[in-house]
């Protein structure tokens, strides 16, 4: 197996640490998650780079995941080869290349054995404007690491299992610490979206809320205005990832404390206390991002304003409007034998196809976890009587048929949806 050719057998499930004069921490990794990456496609890719004497390493988030004992969903690669050199050797090897859009950023996507591999040339930032960067290619791994946002995302992993860590990212990962590479202000000013990326990774990595470095929070506060120039779509992508991670309630509170809300579409007068309470009772149920945000909104206009800034989906916007409208009015019933009745009646009466999913989010918002489990198991019953049934009985007036159908539906609901068509129609002959 190709992985075994690369890996040193003396370091099974442990590490070997060395320090170089350039403050490079190296370690030898051998885990089942790492070995599982070596598909026929990756073996073929590695052979091409080895044959042409270019280095190829796993980069960024995939390294972080592997060091955390996870198999990464996406694996990005970095190399000393330029895009032109990659194109030449892939063409020589008969490897198909797809998605040419990434080439200007140094990324070539090669397809081997029905797998896509994104390989990016090492880069340094020449000029940045807070949103995008002009880059030059380099063969210096440390310079590429210096341009990355967080220490835990700045590591490389050789295909022999050697970790290359220039900024103590591995130590930070072990200590569940999130730090910017070098100066937090400089990293943020290169791309202001890194403010929200910091929050997102804090929620993913940190063990507890409130363990931020003071200088990091101050850098975020000083650069908050930079988010005004970031597109709403990019902000929404990061916010959603933050909101489904750990500590989302704490991180949203920081968004307000550090003056970020006004630049991200959130209401200036957001109800932070309500949001903290909702997060406390709802996070165990994995609420959707909009469910958490809805707690900040005091009125439906806040949802509209958020949509204008972030361009949320129609489904997300409708969920926000629904929660703001019904969070106080649609609550569990007083009948101890059927506390779910108001919710099931609402769903049954609704003409919207996704009402049940919205009510599920409402129950998360309200912290009604027992009812949430019940409603997940509940199927929407079908009202057994139609206008056609009434016409067969001799009713002809459309208005009368509509009135009778509503009366029968109310009767059916009171029976907890148990009355059959015959039982319902039989009540007409009794009246």
UniProtKB/Swiss-Prot annotation:
Tissue: Expressed ubiquitously during early embryogenesis.
Keywords noted in UniProt: ATP-binding, Cytoplasm, Magnesium, Metal-binding, Mitochondrion, Nucleotide-binding, Nucleotidyltransferase, Nucleus, Transferase, Transit peptide, tRNA processing
Binding site for Mg(2+): 74, 76
Residues engaged in binding CTP: 61, 64, 148, 191, 194, 197, 200
Catalyzed reactions per annotation: a tRNA precursor + 2 CTP + ATP = a tRNA with a 3' CCA end + 3 diphosphate; a tRNA with a 3' CCA end + 2 CTP + ATP = a tRNA with a 3' CCACCA end + 3 diphosphate
Consequence of gene loss (knockout): Fishes develop normally for the first 4 days as they can rely on maternal transcripts present in the fertilised egg, but they all die of multisystem defects by nine days post-fertilization (dpf).
GO MF terms, alphabetically ordered: ATP binding; CCA tRNA nucleotidyltransferase activity; CCACCA tRNA nucleotidyltransferase activity; metal ion binding; tRNA binding
Site (May assist in discriminating ATP from CTP): 149
EC id: 2.7.7.72
A Pfam match: PolyA_pol
Transit peptide (residue range): 1-31
Stored SUPFAM superfamilies: Nucleotidyltransferase, Poly A polymerase C-terminal region-like
Binding site for ATP: 61, 64, 148, 191, 194, 197, 200
BP term (GO), one: eye development
Site (Involved in nucleotide selection): 190
Locations listed in the record: Mitochondrion; Cytoplasm; Nucleus
This protein's GO CC annotations: mitochondrion; nucleus
Top-rank taxon: Eukaryota
Protein task: Nucleotidyltransferase that catalyzes the addition and repair of the essential 3'-terminal CCA sequence in tRNAs, which is necessary for the attachment of amino acids to the 3' terminus of tRNA molecules, using CTP and ATP as substrates. tRNA 3'-terminal CCA addition is required both for tRNA processing and repair. Promotes tRNA repair and recycling downstream of the ribosome-associated quality control (RQC) pathway by mediating addition of the tRNA 3'-terminal CCA following cleavage by ankzf1 and repair by elac1.
Name of the protein described by the UniProt record: CCA tRNA nucleotidyltransferase 1, mitochondrial
Native source organism of the sequence: Danio rerio
């Amino acid at each position: 197996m190709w992985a075994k050719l690369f890996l040193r057998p003396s370091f099974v499930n442990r590490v070997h640490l060395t320090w170089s004069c350039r403050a490079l921490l190296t370690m030898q990794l051998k885990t089942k998650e790492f070995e599982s990456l070596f598909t026929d496609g990756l073996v073929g890719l590695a052979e091409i780079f080895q044959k042409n004497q270019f280095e190829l390493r796993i980069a960024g988030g995939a390294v972080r995941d592997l060091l955390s004992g996870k198999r990464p969903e996406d694996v990005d690669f970095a190399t000393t080869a330029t895009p032109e050199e990659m194109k030449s050797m892939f063409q020589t090897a008969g490897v198909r290349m797809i998605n040419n859009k990434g080439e200007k950023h140094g990324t070539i996507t090669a397809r081997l054995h029905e797998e896509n591999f994104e390989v990016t040339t090492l880069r340094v930032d020449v000029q940045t404007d807070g949103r995008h960067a002009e880059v030059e290619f380099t063969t210096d791994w440390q310079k590429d690491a210096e341009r990355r946002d967080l220490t835990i995302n700045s590591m490389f992993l050789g295909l022999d299992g050697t970790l290359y860590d220039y900024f103590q990212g591995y130590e930070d990962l072990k200590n569940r610490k999130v730090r910017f590479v070098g100066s937090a202000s400089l990293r943020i000013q290169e791309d202001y979206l890194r403010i929200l990326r910091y929050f997102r990774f804090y929620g993913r990595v940190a063990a507890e809320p409130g363990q931020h470095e003071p200088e990091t929070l101050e850098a975020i506060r000083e650069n908050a205005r930079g988010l005004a120039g970031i597109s709403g779509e990019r902000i929404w992508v990061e916010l959603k990832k933050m909101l489904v991670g750990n500590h989302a309630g704490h991180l949203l509170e920081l968004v307000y404390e550090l003056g970020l809300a006004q630049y991200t579409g959130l209401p200036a007068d957001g109800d932070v206390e309500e949001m903290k309470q909702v997060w406390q009772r709802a996070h165990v149920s994995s609420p959707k991002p909009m469910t958490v945000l809805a707690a900040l909104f005091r009125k439906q206009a806040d949802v509209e304003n958020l949509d204008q800034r972030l361009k949320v989906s129609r489904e997300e916007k409708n969920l926000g409007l629904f929660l703001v409208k019904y969070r106080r009015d649609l609550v569990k019933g007083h009948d101890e034998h059927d506390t779910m009745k108001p919710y099931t009646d609402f769903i049954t009466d609704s003409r919207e196809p996704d009402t049940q999913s919205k009510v599920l989010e409402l129950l998360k918002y309200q912290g009604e976890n027992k009812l949430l489990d019940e409603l997940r198991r509940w199927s929407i019953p079908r009202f057994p009587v139609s206008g056609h049934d009434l016409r067969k009985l001799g009713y002809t007036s459309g208005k009368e048929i509509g009135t009778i159908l509503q009366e029968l539906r109310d009767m059916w609901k009171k029976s907890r949806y148990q009355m059959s068509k015959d039982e319902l129609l039989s009540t007409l002959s009794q009246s």
